[in-house]
A protein has these predicted regions:
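A short linear hydrophobic-aromatic micro-motif
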Residues: 30-36
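A generic structural motif
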Residues: 43-47
């Protein structure tokens, strides 16, 4: 099965916060590859895996007061 890649625009500014979010997401998506690119203006979150629930990822960030939307 070919992996799915979802890319999100966020407002995560700091590497420490990005690591916390990655840790939380890895508990929910243990076999996914997850990373942030904080160097670009959209503060990109990239998730790659066989099954990705976009709504869950957005909900996890939103519940922590963070903006998160699918980058189209």
């Amino acid at each position: 099965m070919k992996p799915i890649v979802e890319v999100f625009k966020t407002n995560v500014q700091h590497p420490e916060l990005a690591e916390q979010i990655i840790s939380i997401l890895r508990r929910r998506l243990p076999v996914s590859r997850i990373n942030f690119d904080l160097e670009v203006c959209d503060k990109i979150l990239r998730v790659e895996g066989e099954q990705i629930c976009v709504e869950t990822i957005i909900e996890i960030l939103s519940s922590r007061g963070l903006a998160c939307e699918v980058l189209t």
